Regions:
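Helix N-terminus capping/helix-initiation residues
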Residues: 29, 109-110, 299
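Polybasic low-complexity intrinsically disordered regions
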Residues: 59-75, 79, 83-89, 93, ...
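Charged, often Cys/His-bearing segments associated with DNA-binding zinc-finger transcription factors
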Residues: 1-64, 76, 105-106, 116-132, ...
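Acidic, contiguous segments within the catalytic cores of piggyBac-derived transposases
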Residues: 35-38, 42-55, 251, 264-280, ...
Length: 329
């Protein structure tokens, strides 16, 4: 965001700011990182003995219909569908081919079973390894549900309103893994989803970092209710003023406002650690490049299942290897 450096006189410095060279970085573990990227696309598939035994659902002991396939089988199929961008019938064919190539005597859930079970599937919660304090980065983005494609809009325009959902995620700044994910309607305020994201996290939160859209009392109240010692790094909105108790009992926001007034926004970002927020934007970019920018599901429950499986899949891919880099210019 080059404009923030010259907000007061940007019309005089536009060309100079845009011509400023971008920072350059060098990856220090290129061979290991390249190998991890190749492993993300590997078609090597195997079934452990435990997975074979758990493929069929355990018989119910209560009244009601019996599930034929376990949650493991449904999760496996829906995850492969997501990674390879398949329709449900194509997913059924892929799983059938894999099981046939491995010579296993396992039945394959059909497309209607995958669709039905996706509505009730309980995806295991995202678990963060104990690696130290959690600096939580929060942001949201839009995911398409349907409507005219980009080329059709560019060529002919569109008379139909496009449908969207909002993806809300919380990212661990240290590992880059997604630790919380929610989906909502496009008109839901980002701040309204903070409670739902915090409910998915068991670890203590050292810092909560988000953009100015989260500069609301209900956000700071929700974070403080969970842990009063959590640092809340959210830039105050334009025109913000200190609280009435700023002289006697200043809030974190009051301290931020004073520092910004004294030293400027950029100095505050560097000193506070707010610049870590770029990592959640990288996670959103990774989601759209790997999973896609469109939801395949059409109901609230299956959308939630899709989001949870996507987050778990991205975390597994990230666990294969991450780049280490240093700035060189």
């Amino acid at each position: 965001m080059p404009f923030k450096y010259h907000a007061g006189h940007r019309h005089h410095t536009l060309l100079r700011v845009l011509s400023r060279p971008k920072p350059r970085y060098r990856v220090t573990n290129r061979s290991e990182y390249d190998a991890s990227l190749k492993r993300r696309g590997s078609l090597t598939v195997w079934f452990t003995d435990e997975a074979i035994q758990a493929w069929r659902a355990e018989p119910r002991t209560t009244p009601g219909g019996q599930s034929h396939y376990s949650a493991l089988a449904i999760t496996t199929a829906l995850t492969m569908r997501m990674v390879f961008h398949l329709a449900l019938r194509q997913t059924e064919g892929l799983i059938e081919s894999v099981i046939g190539l491995l010579g296993l005597d396992l039945e394959v859930p059909d497309y209607s079973t995958l669709s039905r079970r996706g509505k009730t599937l309980e995806v295991p919660p995202l678990r963060r390894p104990a690696t130290g304090p959690l600096h939580l980065l929060v942001d949201s983005t839009g995911l398409k549900l349907g409507g005219a494609g980009e080329w059709l809009i560019e060529k002919h325009g569109t008379s139909r309103r496009r449908s969207w959902r909002k993806l809300h995620i919380g990212v661990d700044a240290d590992s880059g893994e997604i630790v919380a994910a929610e989906v909502s309607g496009k008109d839901i305020d980002d701040a309204a989803m903070v409670d739902a994201l915090l409910d998915q996290i068991d670890d203590p939160i050292t810092a909560f970092i988000a953009d100015g859209g989260y500069d609301q009392d209900r956000v700071s109240d929700a974070v403080a209710e969970r842990d009063p010692d959590t640092a809340i790094l959210v830039p105050p909105r334009l025109g913000a003023v200190v609280s009435a108790s700023a002289e006697t009992a200043p809030t974190q926001r009051d301290h931020h406002l004073r520092m910004i007034a004294e030293r400027g926004l950029i100095a505050w970002q560097k000193a506070s650690g707010y610049n870590l927020r770029a990592k959640v934007e990288a996670s959103i970019s990774r989601y759209k490049r790997v999973i896609g920018d469109t939801l395949r599901s059409r109901t609230d429950r299956t959308e939630a299942t899709e989001i949870a499986l996507a987050a778990a899949t991205l975390n597994r891919m990230l666990g294969l290897g991450r780049p280490s880099y240093v700035r060189i210019a």
